[in-house]
Amino acid sequence: MQWLADYWWIILILLVGMILNGIKELRRLDHKRFLDNKPELPPHRDNNAQWDDEDDWPDQNKKK
């Protein structure tokens, strides 16, 4: 870990460079064009659809 104490500034420069490149690429992104051309999402499929019709509660009008 001695090398980390000696060369911490190089690691810091690399991290700052990666952050700046990320910001630069995000600025190039045209979000308006993406929103105009985005694909339609398929309808949401409920995984519990087969159980939705079943009545979980007992009938209150049943005579005991």
UniProtKB/Swiss-Prot annotation:
The cross-references to Pfam families, in alphabetical order and at most eight, read: UPF0370 (PF13980)
The UniProt keywords, alphabetically, are: Cell membrane, Membrane, Transmembrane, Transmembrane helix
Its transmembrane ranges are: 3-23
Compositional bias, Basic and acidic residues, is annotated for: 36-47
**Chain positions covered by the region annotation Disordered:** 36-64
Subcellular location(s): the record lists: Cell membrane
Q: Which domain of life is it from?
A: Bacteria
Offer a single GO CC term for the protein.
plasma membrane
Give membrane topology per the record: Single-pass membrane protein
What HAMAP family does the annotation carry? Answer: UPF0370
Under the heading NCBIfam families, the entry gives:
PRK13664.1
Q: Which family does it belong to?
A: Belongs to the UPF0370 family.
Q: What's the protein called, per UniProt?
A: UPF0370 protein YPO3055/y1425/YP_2677
